[in-house]
Amino acid sequence: MNIVNSLDLSNITTNHVAAAVCAGIAVYAIVAGRNRGKKYPPGPKGHPLIGSLFEMPIQNAHVVYKEWAKTYGDMIFFKVLGQPFLILSSEETITDLLDKRSTIYSSRPRMPMVVELMGWDYTLGLLPYGERWRFLRREFHRFMSPTAVSNYRQIQENSVYTFLNNLVESPEQFSKHLRLFYGSISMKVSYGINVKSAEDQYLLDAEGAMSGFMEAGIPGRFWVDLFPALKYVPSWMPGAEFKRKAARWARLNDISLERPFKHVLDQLKKGVASQSVSATLIEELPDQNSPDRKEKETIARNISATTFLAGIDTIHSTTQAFFYAMAQFPEVQKKAQAEIDAVVGDKRLPTFEDRDQLPYVNALVKELIRWSEVAPLGIYHSTTEDDEYKGYFIPKGTIVMTNAWSILTDPVTYPDPFAFKPERYLKNGVMNPDAPRPEDLAFGRGRRICPGRYLADETLFMTSVGVLAGFNISPPLDKSGKPIKLKNERVGTITLTPPKFECRIEPRSPAIRTMIHDTAESISAL
């Protein structure tokens, strides 16, 4: 599917399109005149005015770009309606541009639908590079540095043990239990709120906001992303369905921002608030009579929401991929369980203190990050000034994508790339310091590297080791009792996830089943 097929054309009128096209042509003419004669990186030539509008893929874009790279190389350049795009498909180009020239390649492209109409301008990941971004990044780092993240380990362990008990009671609902699991960790860390159900209103609010983001965040999904002037069209006009959708999604976004933060404000006034990111930020606010109180409170609210939402969708998808992988690669599961049994024994469940003694499980987490690659093109970068690289001109405002999936499935670096092999990162039974580091691509690069990567890594480890200690995961059975072979497939656009699948999740022994239940009971009594 290309970008034209994916556009929401509901009720768009001829006048709207004509006006937008005229504006686009004017901008195109100005930019084209300024950059005429420049040597761009190789790529599809495109058509006059519209460029590669009909060639730019939406579905499986990472696969299409990998095919294009066979023709054009590790830098692919094209334009859509005058907007330049650059696809990077090698470690060398990503390092040279995003890391070594990060002052130029660290901004974000304009996203009229998501940012300007739906109100996602508060979130750190979508902010353009600048002083505001640097300030919020520093504030966010206070709560997501390796040292800060270590303070959340008890929350993570307790959440994992509760998740394991939910799997014991209703393993067929593991996807629902995953939603509750990650939502409960994020809600507890961000707001100090204990979430007990996947139908908790706080989680439903956040999921409503995220569903709008996932639909509208696809580049070019709506005409307004191609022609920003359309954002000024009144929402009551025929053809302005995108404005009405944006308004509905913006309301959901506002609710997910305001409701939990207001709860913490009220709890602090009563003196009963739990420790959390939002509680810390609120306690640091100036007096109510201070002239900048409102501004500071908004910043605290935004940082709290960013903490809650940071990576929740991608980590959820990665853990789904964990179950998907274990059901397909039983030999990996058995090796990991043998290591856990040797270190942890059968009298308790694993903790973070066991991590240094579990090299195979650590390698498994690395391979999970590579094999799942839930964000194959990451969040797009944008150049803030003209640049030249290897004799090629890269104009200001170019949208830059990194095809991490292509690199992480390169058979030269990762032989048999679609197999799940933790051994890639081991040497003589210990972690190999010279092995590839898939996390360096999966969590982004340069100054826009994911600030929540340490919490994500620890959560993935604790989830994986807990599930492997407690359960055997295997494919579902057909009517004759034979295992159904799972296909290694992915679905999605911005993020990828396994297609809807079933697997058997069974406690490894009656004793382990009892231990999981008793541990969860002791937590619920706290």
From Swiss-Prot:
<keyword id="KW-0325">Glycoprotein</keyword>
<feature type="binding site" description="axial binding residue">
    <location>
        <position position="450"/>
    </location>
    <ligand>
        <name>heme</name>
    </ligand>
</feature>
<dbReference type="InterPro" id="IPR017972">
    <property type="entry name" value="Cyt_P450_CS"/>
</dbReference>
<keyword id="KW-0408">Iron</keyword>
<keyword id="KW-0349">Heme</keyword>
<dbReference type="InterPro" id="IPR050364">
    <property type="entry name" value="Cytochrome_P450_fung"/>
</dbReference>
<comment type="similarity">
    <text>Belongs to the cytochrome P450 family.</text>
</comment>
<feature type="transmembrane region" description="Helical">
    <location>
        <begin position="12"/>
        <end position="31"/>
    </location>
</feature>
<dbReference type="GO" id="GO:0020037">
    <property type="term" value="F:heme binding"/>
</dbReference>
<keyword id="KW-1133">Transmembrane helix</keyword>
<feature type="glycosylation site" description="N-linked (GlcNAc...) asparagine">
    <location>
        <position position="11"/>
    </location>
</feature>
<dbReference type="InterPro" id="IPR002401">
    <property type="entry name" value="Cyt_P450_E_grp-I"/>
</dbReference>
<keyword id="KW-0472">Membrane</keyword>
<comment type="function">
    <text>Cytochrome P450 monooxygenase; part of the gene cluster that mediates the biosynthesis of alpha-cuprenene and oxidized derivatives. The alpha-cuprenene synthase COP6 is the only sesquiterpene synthase identified in C.cinereus that appears to be part of a biosynthetic gene cluster and is highly specific since it catalyzes the cyclization of (2E,6E)-farnesyl diphosphate into only one product, alpha-cuprenene.</text>
</comment>
<dbReference type="GO" id="GO:0005506">
    <property type="term" value="F:iron ion binding"/>
</dbReference>
<protein>
    <recommendedName>
        <fullName>Cytochrome P450 monooxygenase COX2</fullName>
        <ecNumber>1.-.-.-</ecNumber>
    </recommendedName>
</protein>
<keyword id="KW-0560">Oxidoreductase</keyword>
<feature type="glycosylation site" description="N-linked (GlcNAc...) asparagine">
    <location>
        <position position="302"/>
    </location>
</feature>
<dbReference type="InterPro" id="IPR001128">
    <property type="entry name" value="Cyt_P450"/>
</dbReference>
<dbReference type="Pfam" id="PF00067">
    <property type="entry name" value="p450"/>
</dbReference>
<keyword id="KW-0812">Transmembrane</keyword>
<keyword id="KW-0479">Metal-binding</keyword>
<dbReference type="InterPro" id="IPR036396">
    <property type="entry name" value="Cyt_P450_sf"/>
</dbReference>
<dbReference type="GO" id="GO:0004497">
    <property type="term" value="F:monooxygenase activity"/>
</dbReference>
<dbReference type="GO" id="GO:0016020">
    <property type="term" value="C:membrane"/>
</dbReference>
<comment type="pathway">
    <text>Secondary metabolite biosynthesis.</text>
</comment>
<keyword id="KW-0503">Monooxygenase</keyword>
<dbReference type="GO" id="GO:0016705">
    <property type="term" value="F:oxidoreductase activity, acting on paired donors, with incorporation or reduction of molecular oxygen"/>
</dbReference>
